[in-house]
Amino acid sequence: MNLIPIFVFSKIAKDIFIKNKIDKRLLNKVAYLRSECVPVILYSRLPYSILKAKIEKLGGSIKFELPIINAWSVNLPCNKLAKIASLSGIHFIAEDSTIQVQLNIATQEINSRKVNDLGYTGKGVTIAFLDTGIYPHPDFTKPKNRIVAFYDVVNGKKQPYDDNGHGTHVAGDAAGNGYASNGKYKGVAPEANIVAVKVLDAYGKGLSSDILAGMQWVLDNKDKYNIRIVSLSIGETPSLPTFLDPLVRGVDTLWKHGIVVTVAAGNSGPNYNTITSPGTSRNAITVGAVDDKRTSDISDDEIAQFSGRGSPYLYKPDIVAPGVKIISTASGNVPFGADEIMVNKAYRTATGTSMATPMAAGAAALLLEKNPNLANIQIKNILKSTAIKIGDAGLWTQGSGMINIEEALKKV
């Protein structure tokens, strides 16, 4: 009888243990990238000086710390991943993946115009948009400038700008006041304050670490600017369990600090189990998209085909809002999608769960204006309990249904 030595079993077990500490997407890159450096997010509680020495010894470098998830943004040679993972104090190595944007009648459908007329406009509440930046559009800056802060993770610029257009559009969905259209194209919370954090480049893409750096800035400055809400119209196909997913961990940290977080369900429908990360967060208010057919009559509405769906294992989205051909603020002449159409120099249309998400953020601002003491979980529950069902679409397609701000305010 041939006996396999104990040390062989020990080595196999060790190899399995090490591989389980590395994102599978990174393991797939090892074969063809070899010694090339790749951006990773490294979970470790080692002191900076010790971690820096270990990483540099193996040819890597630390970019910056991500205390929001107890991790580091690091560049590592592909062929040294296993060596790094084997070190004591290294918990997990995740790919620093590329995230992208998730690319009126709408405000009438969710009844925000009615509550605006009653005096609820989001005044005094700040919404932070982590996106491509913001153009200083008249709908944000007149009659007074409501862009209270701008932070640029990508290029380090100080003054507000948007070299893509997506961030400007979503900010208008939530907080545009319609100044350039005499109130015609107005967002849900037209007097809310705006914080714009640029985490995506001119192509609408960015690394997870940059988005996490933006989240960290929001967390560090939430009291200074009264940031009560974060709107995230971004996403990627989930590749890790939620407890290891860097973006989900970031969202959950914001939520634990009392911030309302609205996140796009993603545009990968209509199949089930297509919710994008970080919309997979159990805490976040995940928002799907409705096609309102450009009418204020809800009876002809349908859940958009592209809107991400949940599954029996993930009860998402939480709610839905209009997300097809939404007219909102334009960033000069900067185009950001093939589906967009210029209405005039100041406005353009866009389609996606990206557009639905800030509407939910605006709704949260109206509730917080009426009662600033509401907790984020209370806001989530109010929006869900007052939502209107869209046709016979199921739970994993529409969640609780279309947000109804008029009814939601009655519960506050």
Predicted regions located by residue number:
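Autoinhibitory N-terminal propeptides
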Residues: M1-I69, N79-K114, L118
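Hydrolase catalytic cores
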Residues: A171-A174, V195, V199-D201, T274, ...
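Short beta-alpha junctions and helix-cap segments that line functional grooves
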Residues: N182-K184, L247-V251, N271-I275, Q305-F306
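Short acidic, glycine-rich surface-loop motifs adjacent to enzyme active sites
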Residues: M215-P241, A264
